[in-house]
Amino acid sequence: MANKMKIHLEADYKTFTAFCPVYRPGGQLAAVEMLTHFAHAQANVVIPQEILIPQLNEHQRVLLLQDQINIIEKHYAFFSSHNINVAINIDERLAETILGSDFLIKKMNQLDCIELEISESFPDIAGGKNNPCLQGLSQHFHLSLNNYGAGKATSKAVFDNLFYRIKLDRGFIQHNIKRGSFPPFISAILDHIKPHCHAVVVQGVDDISGLQSIRHFAFDGIQSALFPPVNEEGLSHLLDPPYLLQQPVLQ
């Protein structure tokens, strides 16, 4: 369902929101990632947020963030009653806007289900807690790292305990999962990072055989194309444990 918000660049776009589930290995819904897509007003074209958001000016970015906050607030009773966190993707520009606004910080802190999600390409992420922007965000919000293992950053920010949730990079998983060295390799990574965050999520396991493989490891969550996103009206359906996660783990 498209939201009423319109954004004008070289053409008009309408936004619509989807929620991508993160399930615990046993099938319980742990969190959702909030995805905003942009639909061209005339052409039948949908553009993902990572392509269009960098083109937005500061005013448009704040409007989009406020729209996301309003949607979370609308469904807050659902998220709160089921202990579900909601991740909003941000970049450095939006992070600085948030930290510069007492109003936004207060408003977002009232919705304690909000996580702010950044990628390894976040500027100076290697600085960890010595990065004032990262440190400021972690003091006010739960932070999620979207693509750990993409190879663009050191682990200092992880070892500085800045992240509530760490998601392994989907390309990293897909590149390594069929290798014979994967079991000891991924076990070592989990031992390495689990003491420094609340939850480690695996991404990129998008087929049944891969899903069976990773269920042998101590991941706290699974985000996969096998569990597709839903719109606002479908949120309650995400509470039903996926059939694939109710099956016994093959030995």
What are the residue ranges of the model-derived segments?
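Short, well-ordered coil/turn segments that N-cap beta-strands
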Residues: 81-86, 110-114, 139-142, 164, ...
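Bacterial c-di-GMP phosphodiesterase EAL domain
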Residues: 2-109
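Pre-DFG segment of protein kinase catalytic domains
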Residues: 145
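EAL-type cyclic di-GMP phosphodiesterase domain
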Residues: 40-66, 92-142, 171-192, 208, ...
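EAL-family c-di-GMP phosphodiesterase catalytic domain
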Residues: 2-18, 24-25, 36-43, 117-124, ...
